[in-house]
C-alpha cells in the first residue's frame, strides 16, 4: 500500500534562518525561561556533590527522549543494565533492544559533551560521530550509523499511511547543514532563540535515516551549555516534549507549512521554562531526601561509614551487592554488614536474588520512587 501525500508538508527551502524576528515579541517568555534555567543551574552549582542529582536526571532524559521515538524502556531496566555494565555496551539476548538503544543515547550525549569540552566545534563531522555512537547497536545498526541519507526520507503516520512531512532532499542536505552550522557559529540571537531555531531546523533537515529526533534533542543541551547559558551540560528537556508530544510535533510542522517561526519559539521557551521548573523540583526532592536520610542513616546504622553508604546509593541506586562492597569506599566486612542492615530496614529491595557466583541485584527504593518515569 502506498502512502498518501495529500496532506504532506515539505521543507521550507530558503527560509532559514528567519530574517524578520523581533526579540521584543518574545521578551516575557524569554525572560521567564532564562530565569527558570538560571535557578536550576544555580542550585546545581551550590551543591558540592551534584552527581547525586544529575545521575537520575540523566537516566530520565535518556528514557524519555528515546520514548518519543517509540523506544520503550524503564528507569529500572536502564539502571539494572548499568549495574552489570563494565564500560562497554554490548548486545545480549538477555537485554531488550530498547534498553540497549537508551543506554547508547546516554553514551552518545556524554561523548559529545566531552568532545565539545576538548574544543571540537559543532560541525558535520561532529553530528556524524554522535549518530554513529547512537546507532552503534540495536535496530539502528542497520540504518547507516554516521552516514547521511542518500534517498528522500519522510515522516509519516504509519497506521493511516499518510506522509506528514517531507524533509530537505539529499541533494540539498549539504547546503542546509552548512547553513545551520554557520548560523550556530555566527548568529548573535539570544541563546535560547538560537537553540530553538537550531533544534527545529535540524529536525526539518532530518539528515539521517534514523535517530534524528534524539540527536536534535541532544543539541539543545549541548548548545545551552556551550553558549554559556548553563555552567554544566546538564539540562534535559525531553520530559516536556514527551508530555506534549502532539503540540511539539505540530509546532515544528507549522514552521514549514506557514513559516510560523514565532509559534515554535514560544512553544520552545515555554518548554524550557516548565522543564527547568520541573527539573528543579525533582532535584530539590532528591536533595531533601538526601538530607533526611543523612540523619536517619547516622542514627540507624550507627556506623562511621554511613555517609559513604548514602553517597553510593544516591549515585548507583540499582547495583549488584558486590559493587557496594567493592566501590563504596567501605572496608569489605563493614560494607557487608551495612548492606544486610539496609535490607532489613527496608531501604534496599532485592530485585534479583543471588544465584551461584552472581550477587543479588538491589534497588534503593526511596530514590527510585522519586525518579521513575
Q: Which stretches of residues belong to each language-model region?
A:
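FIC/Doc superfamily catalytic core
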Residues: 1-373
Amino acid at each position: 500500500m502506498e502512502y498518501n501525500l495529500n496532506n504532506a508538508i515539505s521543507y521550507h527551502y530558503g527560509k532559514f534562518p528567519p530574517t524578520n524576528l523581533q526579540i521584543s515579541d518574545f521578551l516575557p517568555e524569554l525572560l521567564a525561561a532564562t530565569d527558570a534555567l538560571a535557578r536550576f543551574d544555580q542550585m546545581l552549582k551550590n551543591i558540592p556533590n551534584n552527581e547525586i542529582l544529575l545521575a537520575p536526571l540523566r537516566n530520565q532524559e535518556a528514557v524519555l527522549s528515546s520514548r518519543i521515538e517509540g523506544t520503550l524502556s524503564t528507569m529500572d531496566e536502564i539502571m539494572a543494565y548499568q549495574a552489570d555494565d563494565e564500560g562497554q555496551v554490548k548486545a545480549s539476548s538477555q537485554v531488550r533492544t530498547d534498553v540497549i538503544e537508551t543506554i547508547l543515547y546516554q553514551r552518545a550525549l556524554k561523548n559529545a559533551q566531552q568532545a565539545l569540552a576538548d574544543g571540537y566545534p559543532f560541525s558535520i563531522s561532529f553530528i556524524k560521530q554522535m549518530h554513529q555512537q547512537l546507532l552503534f547497536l540495536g535496530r539502528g545498526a542497520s540504518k547507516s550509523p554516521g552516514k547521511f541519507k542518500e534517498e528522500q526520507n519522510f515522516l509519516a503516520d504509519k497506521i493511516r499511511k499518510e506522509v506528514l512531512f517531507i524533509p530537505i532532499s539529499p541533494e540539498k542536505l549539504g547546503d542546509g547543514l552548512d547553513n545551520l552550522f554557520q548560523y550556530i557559529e555566527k548568529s548573535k540571537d539570544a541563546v535560547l532563540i538560537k537553540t530553538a531555531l537550531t533544534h527545529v531546523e535540524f529536525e526539518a533537515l532530518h539528515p539521517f535515516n534514523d535517530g534524528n529526533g534524539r540527536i536534535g534533542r541532544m543539541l539543545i543541551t549541548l548548545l545551552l551549555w556551550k553558549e554559556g547559558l548553563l555552567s554544566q551540560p546538564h539540562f534535559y528537556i525531553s520530559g516536556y516534549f514527551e508530555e506534549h508530544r502532539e503540540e511539539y510535533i505540530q509546532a515544528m510542522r507549522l514552521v514549514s507549512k506557514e513559516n510560523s517561526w514565532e509559534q515554535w519559539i514560544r512553544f520552545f521557551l515555554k518548554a524550557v521554562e516548565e522543564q527547568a521548573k520541573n527539573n528543579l523540583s525533582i532535584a530539590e526532592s532528591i536533595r531533601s531526601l538526601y538530607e533526611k536520610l543523612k540523619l536517619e542513616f547516622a542514627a540507624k546504622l550507627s556506623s562511621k561509614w554511613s555517609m559513604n553508604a548514602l553517597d553510593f546509593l544516591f549515585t548507583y541506586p540499582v547495583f549488584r551487592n558486590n559493587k557496594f562492597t567493592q566501590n563504596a569506599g567501605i572496608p569489605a566486612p563493614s560494607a557487608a554488614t551495612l548492606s544486610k542492615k539496609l535490607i532489613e530496614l527496608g531501604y534496599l529491595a532485592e530485585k534479583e536474588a543471588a544465584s551461584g557466583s552472581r550477587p543479588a541485584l538491589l534497588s534503593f527504593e526511596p530514590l527510585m520512587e522519586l525518579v521513575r518515569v
